[in-house]
Amino acid sequence: MGVNQSVGFPPVTGPHLVGCGDVMEGQNLQGSFFRLFYPCQKAEETMEQPLWIPRYEYCTGLAEYLQFNKRCGGLLFNLAVGSCRLPVSWNGPFKTKDSGYPLIIFSHGLGAFRTLYSAFCMELASRGFVVAVPEHRDRSAATTYFCKQAPEENQPTNESLQEEWIPFRRVEEGEKEFHVRNPQVHQRVSECLRVLKILQEVTAGQTVFNILPGGLDLMTLKGNIDMSRVAVMGHSFGGATAILALAKETQFRCAVALDAWMFPLERDFYPKARGPVFFINTEKFQTMESVNLMKKICAQHEQSRIITVLGSVHRSQTDFAFVTGNLIGKFFSTETRGSLDPYEGQEVMVRAMLAFLQKHLDLKEDYNQWNNLIEGIGPSLTPGAPHHLSSL
């Protein structure tokens, strides 16, 4: 009956092969869990390719977030895409670089998790970035987990760790959504800063233990990240996270906000906002109120920009844009792709990002050939926001 779907990830266009691995640091809720995408060497043997949806629990988490029956929806999600794999080397050998690679911290959106932006992350890694994607523990992820020591074990080992799962937090009837989402966005920023600190320590040669069995060996990163060239990026709730993180941490030199959901940011934040921020919006998500808040930030920072990708929808900036077949689309109340071909959309957004990152991280690349895209001049782009905006 055509249950199996596939994910047609765009082939990467950069000069580097891409590796990825997961890192969990700390044995409590305050620890850190993130996926790392990075330039890797060609391995002598065939490397394993990781699953796109890393575990069955994420299928049930997605079903629950989308308000489907957890058991049936999870089963269908798993049948549809549970066997899809990422075209990267799992824990592949890190490709060393004396001057280090620039770093991007990428924050996922509401109801997402660390693997749902793999198309962007793989492409950026192929272009010579290390990309870290924290899986947020503020209960905005579809689901996530942490590992803690089993109570009966005296001698801690990786094998004696117990998983504790964290479900998605829905706003209850009668609750004000802002009072839920605002503390979450602040926690998300703290989690991004913890990942930044971990990678800073590893780069400096300090020992940081990855407690995941068979997880990525962080010591291979020593001296290979250029901590003077760091950007923060995110989609939707992650876009708001990136904007707030830029204001809180001066080590971030710029932010890229993909279809940022501005709602969780408190109004008195805006005078303290830093730039430059590059807002890359889709055509069918933003409201005039939201765009006006973006304009407030742009008015304070002349290098900040807003562009809109015409023919795109909110999920055009996630991996769901590349899922073929109709089954997954039935789970979503809104479209997973717009009228713009998703591969064309990915290409123009990545090129715009790269031009912006070159400009503000002082990269020695040729991405300035796409500087016109930063101004919203190019195929399927418009500067600012279109006149006819959707109402959420």
Curated annotation (Swiss-Prot):
Q: Where is the lipid attached (N-myristoyl glycine)?
A: G2
* Catalytic activity, reaction form: a 1-O-alkyl-2-acetyl-sn-glycero-3-phosphocholine + H2O = a 1-O-alkyl-sn-glycero-3-phosphocholine + acetate + H(+); a 1-O-alkyl-2-acyl-sn-glycero-3-phosphocholine + H2O = a 1-O-alkyl-sn-glycero-3-phosphocholine + a fatty acid + H(+); 1-O-hexadecyl-2-acetyl-sn-glycero-3-phosphocholine + H2O = 1-O-hexadecyl-sn-glycero-3-phosphocholine + acetate + H(+); 1-O-hexadecyl-2-acetyl-sn-glycero-3-phosphocholine + a 1-O-(1Z-alkenyl)-sn-glycero-3-phosphoethanolamine = 1-O-(1Z-alkenyl)-2-acetyl-sn-glycero-3-phosphoethanolamine + 1-O-hexadecyl-sn-glycero-3-phosphocholine
**Keyword presence, Transferase:** yes
Per UniProt, what is one Pfam family of this protein?
A: PAF-AH_p_II
Q: Identify the GO cellular component terms for this protein.
A: cytoplasm; endoplasmic reticulum membrane
Return one GO MF term: phospholipid binding
* Active-site residues per Swiss-Prot or TrEMBL entry: S236 (nucleophile), D259 (charge relay system), H314 (charge relay system)
Topological category with respect to the lipid bilayer: Lipid-anchor
Which is a GO BP term held by this UniProt record? Answer: lipid catabolic process
Chief place where the protein resides = cytoplasm
Tissue-level expression reads:
Broadly expressed in different tissues, but high in B- and T-lymphocytes. In brain, expression is restricted to amygdala and frontal cortex.
Gene3D superfamilies to which the protein is assigned, alphabetical: alpha/beta hydrolase
InterPro entries (UniProt xref): AB_hydrolase_fold, PAF_acetylhydro_eukaryote
Briefly describe activity regulation. Answer: Inhibited by phenylmethanesulfonyl fluoride, 3,4,dichloroisocoumarin, diisopropyl fluorophosphate (DFP) and diethyl p-nitrophenyl phosphate (DENP).
- Entry keywords, A to Z: Cytoplasm, Endoplasmic reticulum, Hydrolase, Lipid degradation, Lipid metabolism, Lipoprotein, Membrane, Myristate, Transferase
Where can this protein be found? Cytoplasm; Membrane; Endoplasmic reticulum membrane
Q: What is its EC number?
A: 3.1.1.47, 2.3.1.149
Q: Which family does it belong to?
A: Belongs to the serine esterase family.
> Quaternary arrangement and interactors, per the entry?
Monomer.
Q: What does this protein do?
A: Catalyzes the hydrolyze of the acetyl group at the sn-2 position of platelet-activating factor (PAF) and its analogs, leading to their inactivation. Hydrolyzes propionyl and butyroyl moieties approximately half as effectively as PAF. Also catalyzes transacetylation of the acetyl group from platelet-activating factor (PAF) to lysoplasmalogen and to sphingosine, producing plasmalogen analogs of PAF and N-acetylsphingosine (C2-ceramide) respectively. Has a marked selectivity for phospholipids with short acyl chains at the sn-2 position.
Full protein name? Platelet-activating factor acetylhydrolase 2, cytoplasmic
Annotated source species: Homo sapiens (Human)
